[in-house]
Design a protein with these regions (language model features):
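Active-site neighborhoods and metal-handling regions in enzymes and metal-associated proteins
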Residues: 2-382
Length: 382
């Protein structure tokens, strides 16, 4: 669900110490050659982190990591970042200082790699200011999105990535009891979200978001925590997550404050049943839309089909939302190493909402949950 404001990325360690990273540039260059692309220009912290382990974006200062179809690499970076780039194992770094024109280095790159009339892919997160400047510097080049190429690599996690995601999931799981203990009448959504954030930080994660939606606010899937006080009997949706070395967790649990009505318990059981039905359908080769359908059919049969108005899940990794998307119309088959959320929900306007979310990884014989299993019954915090 929505990540809200991101906390700053602050993790960096040399490529040589990050299992799996060193081969990613080679795999990307092979994909570029197969797709007829001459070079890929990366500028986002996520894409750069995936390829090099250096989680940094240039912001107002131009920072580009170029990968050629022949495997060559070069970084054009602010002098402020050049030392870090070298430490990450990037051999060819062209630094520029404030007051200098970084496009001189782009012109050199175009000449050295014969890119002046080439096909150049860029990541979808590249700032428009970067792209416009690149198009002006290389006017005969054809620029296109490179995200489909990179997504093909990023959607399949290796064991080192899965280990980091398990750790992030475990931290989120272990933060939940603090929220349960603090969920009493009068505490505000914002205060409860702050407790979750502090607990994830204490446990060693980098908090990325914490959303608390109490009572009628829980019927708004995109609600952001505010100063609404939690009341006795409120159903409360908790959606939160953290990062470990850039890899994300994302968990949603629904609880009740003090006591729960039978209607709330019934809706919770329905959503839990839909969650389990979706999980049971996960295996390699199954179309992503089949997982969505499995959850949706359970809720529709109970008469709440119109109250489940979002997709069943989204991929997750270095991005909180990435491929594969678990939605009707996505016939792409699931593959071993895909990681995504399973998060059906029912939202009753003016009353409450219920959502249950776990992150799963597709395995050869089904799936693995990367965080603890949800309760089959609505938990009452007292």
């Amino acid at each position: 669900m929505p990540p809200g404001e991101q906390f700053p990325r602050c993790h960096t360690r040399p490529v040589a110490t990050i299992p799996g990273v060193s081969g990613r540039v080679d795999r990307l260059s092979r994909e570029l050659a197969e797709d007829g692309v001459d070079a890929f220009f990366v500028s986002s912290a996520v894409s750069l982190g995936y390829l090099t382990g250096m989680h940094e974006a240039g912001g107002e200062r131009l920072l580009i990591f170029a990968v050629g179809r022949d495997g060559r690499t070069r970084m054009i970076a602010p002098a402020l970042s050049a030392t870090q780039a070298g430490r990450m194992g990037i051999a060819d770094v062209r630094p520029w200082r404030d007051g200098e024109n970084p496009m001189v280095h782009v012109d050199d790159l175009g000449r050295d790699w014969n890119l002046r009339s080439a096909v150049i892919a860029v990541d979808d997160d590249m700032p428009a200011s970067y792209l416009l400047a690149l198009q002006e510097a290389l006017p005969a080049a054809l620029f296109r999105t490179g995200q489909p190429v990179l997504s093909r690599l990023m959607r399949i996690k290796d064991q080192s990535e899965l280990d980091l995601m398990r750790r992030a999931g475990r931290i989120a799981d272990e933060a939940l009891p603090a929220a349960l203990a603090a969920c009493t009448q009068g505490v505000t959504e914002r205060e409860l979200a702050s407790i979750l954030t502090a607990e994830m930080l204490r446990l060693g994660g980098t908090p990325t978001f914490a959303i608390v939606a109490a009572g009628a606010n829980g019927a708004e899937p995109h609600h952001h925590s505010d100063d609404t006080p939690i009341r006795e009997g409120d159903v409360v949706v908790l959606d939160f997550g953290c990062q470990v070395e850039g890899y994300n967790s994302d968990i949603t649990r629904t609880i009740a404050c003090g006591h729960a009505t039978e209607e709330a318990r019934e809706v919770y059981r329905l959503v839990f049943t839909a969650h389990q039905a979706a999980r049971a359908a996960i295996r390699p080769g199954v179309p992503a839309e089949a997982i969505d359908r499995a959850a949706r059919e359970v809720i529709a049969r109970a008469g709440h089909g119109e109250r489940f108005m979002h997709r069943t899940g989204h991929g997750i990794g270095l991005r909180i939302h990435e491929e594969p998307y678990i939605i009707e119309g996505n016939a792409s088959p699931l593959e071993v190493g895909n990681c995504f959320s399973v998060e059906p929900g029912v939202y009753l306007p003016g009353q409450f909402g219920v959502r249950i979310e776990n992150i799963v990884a597709v395995t050869s014989d089904g799936h693995e949950s990367l965080n603890a299993e949800p309760s089959p019954e609505l938990i009452v915090a007292s």
